[in-house]
C-alpha cells in the first residue's frame, strides 16, 4: 500500500455517456488530477474536466471518432500514487499480466487500478493494490441506484476512497 508524506486528491469518473452534471465539477474542485475510465462520448466533458485539473482518460467501448482514438489503457503517477486505468477490467488485467501496458513492467504492482464499463461502483484491495470502479456518472446499472463518482485521497495512512452520488440525468428520471 502506498504511503505518502503529502496529500493528494484524485477525482475518478467513468461512463459519463455525454452527460456531466454540474455537481461533478463542484465535487472535483480542488483535486490534483482526474481519471476518466472511458465511455466519455462527448469532447466537452473532457474540456470541462481539464479546466479543473490535469486529466488522464481512456477510450471506452462506446467512444468513437476522436475519443475512440484515446488509448485503451494508460499508466501514470500522481502524488506518489502509481495508477493504471482502462475501461474494461478483464481486458486490463489480461494486458497487465502479459506486460502489454506501456510504462508498466510485467511484475510491477500499481497502487491503484481504475476501470469502468459495468456501471457498478466497487472497491477491492488485492495484494496491496486498490481496484476501483467509480460506477457511472450518468447511467447507473440498476434502475434504483444513483449515478456515482469517486474521490481517492492519499496521505500518511495510505489510500482512501469516497463515493459521491450525483443527480440523475433529467431525461432519466422516473
Per-segment meaning from a language model:
Residues 1-55, 63-76, 80, 144-147, ...:
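N-terminal active-site segment of His-dependent metallophosphoesterases
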Residues 2-11, 75-84, 125-131, 154-162:
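Beta-strand-turn-beta hairpins that frame and shape the catalytic cleft
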Residues 12-14, 33-39, 56-61, 84-87, ...:
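Active-site neighborhood of phospho(di)ester-bond hydrolases with catalytic His/Asp-centered motifs
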Residues 18, 42, 90, 120, ...:
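Short active-site segment of divalent metal-dependent hydrolases/proteases
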Residues 56, 93-162:
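Conserved beta-sheet core of the metallophosphoesterase superfamily
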Residues 56-99, 103-104, 109:
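Helix-adjacent hinge/juxtasegments
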Residues 161-173:
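Short, solvent-exposed aromatic-acidic interface loops
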Amino acid at each position: 500500500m502506498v504511503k505518502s508524506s503529502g496529500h493528494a486528491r484524485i477525482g475518478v469518473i467513468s461512463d459519463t455517456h455525454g452527460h456531466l452534471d454540474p455537481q461533478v465539477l463542484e465535487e472535483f474542485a480542488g483535486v490534483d488530477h482526474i481519471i476518466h475510465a472511458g465511455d466519455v462520448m462527448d469532447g466537452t466533458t473532457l474540456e470541462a474536466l481539464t479546466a479543473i485539473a490535469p486529466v488522464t482518460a481512456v477510450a471506452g467501448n462506446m467512444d468513437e471518432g476522436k475519443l475512440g482514438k484515446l488509448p485503451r489503457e494508460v499508466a501514470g503517477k500522481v502524488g506518489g500514487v502509481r495508477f493504471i486505468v482502462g475501461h474494461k477490467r478483464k481486458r486490463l488485467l489480461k494486458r497487465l499480466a502479459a506486460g502489454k501496458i506501456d510504462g508498466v513492467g510485467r511484475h510491477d504492482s500499481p497502487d491503484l487500478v481504475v476501470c469502468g464499463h459495468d456501471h457498478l461502483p466497487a472497491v477491492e484491495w488485492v495484494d496491496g493494490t486498490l481496484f476501483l470502479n467509480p460506477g457511472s456518472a450518468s447511467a447507473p446499472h440498476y434502475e434504483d441506484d444513483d449515478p456515482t463518482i469517486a474521490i481517492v485521497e492519499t496521505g500518511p495512512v495510505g489510500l482512501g476512497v469516497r463515493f459521491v452520488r450525483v443527480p440523475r440525468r433529467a431525461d432519466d428520471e422516473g
